[in-house]
């Protein structure tokens, strides 16, 4: 059964009608694995405040839980204690909970009507994993989908290891202060300021969207959402959060973790070259590869204008649609890679980058931790 996500989340959402605009994104990674305080990403997002309208903001940080590096850090929002009790029963049946607590926040006049926000550091119970015949990651994905589709008023919004997603209805900088991000240290940060155009502003619909260690922030509109959603359902993913970006997080998990595609190849699935360009490609091997990808993964092609920044355990990437209908800028400084909607957001925290460029349409910008980190 899939619970209809509507009335039970009414107090977490704000509908203002459709207003064309563009979200704001920023991502930072230290390829040497140096951890940075959360106020850095907050300041970058503050610079592009006007790209959002206060109906959603959020962040993901990697490396923030070194004391629980081998545990899944499960962040959950609950509408009420009844949903919390039902969810915790499912968690205790499936997981060994090492530690649980309310996610630390601080009072803010800018963030209102917050749900109950809890985090659980846990490991799958070996007997349950064996009985299910699944790997730990697959077991966790199935558990997340079960909770999100069957427990009323409950949503798992982060489920990776040594990382966490923090999001709410509000401007990004206010969300960051609400969740006390300056107290966290991460080697990768991604941030998002939302301006919803087709879907409601509510807590679960804020970005980033996450599954396991994949976290996605997105500016644009995924017109292929229906096809992508039906394709993902064949592999056990359920889209319940009223926002098209959700499919992007699940597609990265499916293509790279489940199907084992290299990151660069997965990007060529999502932002595939046009047939007219494949037909005239003079590199026969490349032509064969792109033809095969489009035939095998046609339903994973993401159509529409988009710019995304994706965080994962050992890296970060930025990717545009194949026509570049949304802005995306990249820069480097020493071991740092920056990706953002605007150069100004990068220069706010890195006034003199070594290099600044606009990535080509459909060409990923990838920063990964060095091998010994």
What kind of feature is each model-predicted range?
Residues 1-373:
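Conserved short alpha-helical segments that host acidic/polar catalytic motifs at enzyme active sites
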């Amino acid at each position: 059964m899939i619970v209809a996500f509507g009335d039970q989340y009414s107090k977490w959402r704000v509908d203002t009608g459709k207003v064309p605009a563009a979200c704001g994104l920023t991502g930072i990674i230290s390829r040497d694995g140096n951890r940075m305080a959360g106020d850095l990403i907050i300041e970058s997002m503050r610079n592009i405040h006007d790209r959002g309208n206060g109906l959603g903001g959020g962040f993901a940080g990697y490396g923030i839980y070194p004391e629980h590096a081998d545990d899944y850090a499960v962040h959950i929002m609950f509408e009420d204690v009844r949903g919390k009790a039902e969810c915790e029963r499912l968690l205790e049946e499936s997981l060994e909970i090492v530690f649980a607590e309310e996610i630390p926040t601080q009072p803010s006049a800018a963030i209102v009507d917050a749900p109950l926000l809890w985090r659980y550091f846990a490991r799958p119970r070996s007997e349950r994993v064996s009985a299910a015949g699944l790997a730990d990651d697959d077991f966790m994905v199935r558990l997340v989908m079960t909770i999100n589709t069957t427990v009323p008023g409950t949503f798992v919004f982060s489920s990776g290891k040594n990382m966490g997603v923090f999001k709410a209805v509000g401007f990004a900088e206010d969300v960051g202060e609400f969740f006390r991000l300056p107290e966290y240290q991460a080697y990768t940060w991604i941030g998002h300021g939302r301006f919803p155009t087709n879907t409601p502003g509510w807590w679960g619909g804020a970005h980033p969207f996450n599954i396991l260690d994949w976290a996605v922030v997105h500016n644009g509109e995924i017109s292929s959402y229906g096809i992508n959603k039906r394709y993902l359902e064949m592999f056990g993913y359920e889209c319940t959060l009223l926002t098209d970006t959700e499919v992007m997080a699940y597609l990265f998990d499916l293509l790279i973790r489940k199907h084992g595609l290299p990151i660069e190849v997965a990007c060529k699935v999502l932002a595939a070259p046009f047939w007219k360009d494949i037909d005239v490609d003079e590199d026969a091997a490349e032509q064969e590869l792109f033809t095969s990808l489009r035939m095998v993964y046609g339903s994973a092609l993401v159509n529409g204008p988009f710019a995304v920044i994706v965080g994962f355990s050992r890296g970060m990437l930025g990717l545009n649609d194949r026509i570049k209908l949304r802005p995306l800028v990249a820069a480097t400084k020493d071991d740092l890679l920056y990706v953002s909607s605007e150069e100004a957001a990068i220069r706010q925290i890195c006034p003199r980058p070594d290099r600044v460029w606009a990535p080509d349409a459909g060409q990923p910008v990838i920063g990964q931790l060095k091998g010994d980190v």
